[in-house]
Amino acid sequence: KNQDTMKVLPAQVDIDLTNVCNQDCYYCNSLDHRTNMPVQKKYTEYIDLIDKLATWRIHSPKSVGTLHTVTFTGGGEPTLLPNYERVVEHTIDHGFLTSITTNGFKLEKLLENVDYNKLRKMGWIGIDIDAGEEELYEKIRRTISKTSTFTKVMENARNLVSVGVNVDFKILLGE
């Protein structure tokens, strides 16, 4: 290796935590990906990855750029990774601007297990909502639940906002 080569570092990294999903959205473009790659890593592997990424935050004369932002997303639902909230907290602890793109159904684990002061340091939690009313939401998301998924997602969003977390609602437009 040539030690004089400059490294170009990204400002942001997106990490797919899992391919598992708890919804069956009619428009999903990840279904084939989820079906053919159902393997899920352990949360400790993501903790190790965040530790490695933290070394990219150190300024060096041999690198251009600094990693600032980590966004958790997935070919599935990132909050379904067991102990995902520990990975999120670890990322915040390393000083990364941390965000999650989610369907919003399992966000209560963040509120139950991560200090609110840490949660307030997050960049945002982006909730894919797709509809502003329950009946259409349930039709698009094709969820199977004894209770309203829409109601639970809205409750999770309200609870996060009430402690100062920046929540963004995202929609997919189509015909």
Regions found by a protein language model. Give the residues of each.
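Conserved AdoMet/S-adenosylmethionine-binding subsite of the radical SAM
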Residues: L81-E175
